[in-house]
Every structure is written in C-alpha cells, then in structure tokens.
Design a protein with these regions (language model features):
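Short, small/polar residue-rich loop motifs at catalytic or cofactor-binding pockets
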Residues: 286-290
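Radical SAM/AdoMet-radical enzyme domain recognition
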Residues: 95-115, 121-234
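Flexible glycine/acidic-rich beta-alpha junction loops that bind and position SAM and/or redox cofactors
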Residues: 209-211, 230-251, 274-285, 310-311
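A short acidic, helix-capping loop that chelates divalent metal ions and anchors anionic groups
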Residues: 83-88, 171-177, 239-244
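Conserved alpha-helical substructure of the radical SAM core
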Residues: 3-153
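C-terminal accessory region of radical SAM enzymes
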Residues: 251-281, 300, 305-359
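Short acidic, glycine/proline-enriched helix-loop-strand junctions
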Residues: 123-125, 129-137, 200-210, 239-272
Length: 362
C-alpha cells in the first residue's frame, strides 16, 4: 500500500471513529457526517493535483498563528525557535493573509490544519478567519487557560474548530512545567466543553520522565471521564544538549509503540495519534510536505515546527510553491536516500544536514 492510500484510509478511520463518538449529540453527529464527505472530496482533490500537476499535496498542515502566550512553560520549543517571543512588533500575517492560505489549502485538498503558537486563543481574529473555511478541520492546540463562556460558545458555533488542551500528565507534572494552577484551570475548561457536549482532545508532550504516567490506564480513564475523546502524544524534541536526556531513545520508542497499541484496544471510544511514533508505520518522516509541513507566524514555510528552516513564504509565494519548495524537495530526497527513521524526530537528528541543505552546501 502506498503512502497516499495509507494516509487516506487512516483519515477515514479517524472520521469514522469520531462519528461513533458523537452519535449521542445530533448537532455534532451531523457535522461529522458532513466532514466525512468533505474528507472524501479533499482526497479526490489531492489525487487530481497529483495526476494533473504532479504536485503531491499533504493532507495535514500545521500553522503557528500566534506569537504571544500567557504562560512560560519550561522547555517551550516555540519560544526557543522564536515563534513565540511576546514581541508586539514581530512580523505576523494578517487575518486576510491567513484566510487566503486556509482557502488555498482547502482548494488543494488539505483536510486538517493544526493551529498552534504561542497561544492561538490570543488571536481571536485569526481563529475567526479559520472558522470560515468549513472544508478544513482545525485542531486548536491551546493551554486551556483562556477557555471560558465566550470561547465555549465559539467552539459550539464552529464545530470545525476542535480544542486540544495541552497537559504534561496529572497535577504535579503539568504544574511543574506549565505553572501553578494550570492543571486545575485546564480541567475546568474540559468540564465546560463536556457540559456543552463538544468534541475535544488533549495534547501531551511525552518524555523519558512522564511517558508511563500519561499512557497509564488510570490517567486515560481520568481523561475519558472528563469527556476527552482525542489524545495527541508528541515526543519531546530537545532544544539543546541539556535536555537531550528527556528525548526518547530506541527502547522508549519501542515501548511507547506497544503501549499505545494496547490503549487503542482498551479505549475504543478514544482516538490516539502518536507523533512522530506513528510515522514509523508510514516508512519515515512525514515532514517537508510528505504528509505535512509548517507555516510560521510570518508565513515562512518550514519542514516542521521542530525544524525552523525556510526558503519559501506561503503568503508571498502561495501554498503550491511552498509545497514544491527546493528545501522540501531536498529533504524528501535525502530521507529517501538513507535518513533512517528510528522512531524519534528525524529532522532533529539530522538538523545539521537540514541547515546545510538550506545553505546549498550539499
């Protein structure tokens, strides 16, 4: 089975499971049923682009729309990479520019656009621009502290905007990294979303220190009781040598893979997505347009949020040019020629080579 077929089937399976999860809520069930048709249409659009123009459109996009955040989480990659620096004068795209990108993405067949930051909920104007593009599902990765009555109503009105609340584990682990009181505030947000019967998820950065806790039956049962139906596991990527002990090694990757498969069987009403762990089944790294790519707040098209290198701007050059960027092509070629995927972040492991490709040294 080739990559496009595998990913298309995986997306259909996700949507089918999402539909089963919302059968008790007619409002959301109608929305998911419509999105199932939209995903099928997007798959057809991607196929047409490939056949007629030779452009392999990825089904996923990651967009960092915010440069500010109300938290100071330890080891935040967005701050380290300069995405979030709380600088008001930092160059960012306008709502109109983001709207153009999102509409272009929908027209090309991109099904999911993950909104990140910074804290996306600090940019209500950009969220409104995204919400208008109803042919794309937008998981909104938020720390959960800004969800109140106003945002709960926003998510109820725009069901294609799916809140994904970040945690590090239970109270001690979350507050240790994110700040005192953040865990309880996140749970309060989950409770508000649950009462409105809204579909929402959580995102967990997994490290060598917390992966057993966040994959435990007790922790996942707690999330299920809170109404959470979607779990993103994102393996920690070091921002310098001092944090490399937190990154997975081969033995952690193998154990994590086994545990997640077990939990998928145990918690059939929850959707589990493991990144980059699930890439192993897809023959390696999906970044640089193979399965997804990243757009920064200024429009820079980058292989991945963890690989902040760019030679193309999506706002200036268009999304088609971003997908076909020389850097992305070089990375995909280098990966095919032997950048082995062991389960961790391939681009981090080859960061010097990626930078060299950008500088045309190879």
């Amino acid at each position: 089975m080739n990559l496009n077929t595998y990913m298309a089937e995986s997306i259909r399976n996700i949507m089918a499971k999402a539909y089963l999860n919302v059968l008790g809520n007619p409002h959301e069930a109608r929305f998911v049923a419509r999105m199932q048709r939209t995903v099928t249409k997007a798959e057809w659009r991607r196929k047409i682009y490939l056949e007629k123009e030779g452009v392999e459109v990825p089904p996923f996009l990651i967009a960092s729309i915010a440069t500010t955040c109300n938290l100071q989480c330890k080891g935040c990659y967005a701050r380290k990479n300069g995405i979030a620096d709380d600088t008001p004068s930092k160059e960012t795209l306008s709502p109109e520019q983001w709207s153009t990108i999102f509409h272009e993405a929908a027209d090309m067949g991109i099904s999911f656009c993950l909104l990140a930051g910074g804290e996306p909920l600090t940019r209500r104007d950009l969220l409104e621009s995204a919400a208008e593009v109803e042919d794309i599902i937008f998981p909104v990765f938020t720390n959960g502290t800004m969800i109140g009555a106003v945002y709960t109503e926003f998510f109820r009105k725009h069901l294609n905007m799916v809140p994904v609340i970040s945690l590090e584990g239970e109270l001690a682990a979350t507050d240790e990294r994110r700040g005192q009181g953040v865990f309880q505030r996140a749970l309060l947000s989950m409770e508000m979303l649950r009462k409105e019967k809204l579909f929402f998820g959580t995102s967990i950065t997994v490290t060598t220190e917390n992966y057993r806790e966040v994959t435990s039956e007790a922790f996942l049962s707690h999330l299920a009781e809170l109404g959470c139906r979607l779990v993103f596991y994102v393996e920690y990527v070091p921002f310098d040598e001092t944090t490399e002990h937190l990154a997975f090694r081969d033995e952690h990757v193998a154990e994590m893979e086994q545990i997640v498969e077990l939990r998928r069987e145990q918690f059939k009403d929850m959707i589990f997505i493991s990144f980059p762990g699930d890439e192993k089944a897809l023959d390696g790294c999906l970044a640089a347009g193979r399965g997804f790519f990243h757009i920064g707040p200024d429009g820079a098209a980058e292989p991945c949020p963890f690989s902040p290198f760019s030679d193309t701007n999506a706002a200036r050059d268009g999304l088609r040019a971003a997908i076909a960027s020389p850097l992305f092509h070089k990375i995909r070629t280098a990966r095919a020629l032997g950048w082995e995927h062991t389960g961790g972040c391939t681009l981090y492991e080859h960061r010097d080579e990626v930078e060299a490709l950008l500088q045309n040294k190879h």
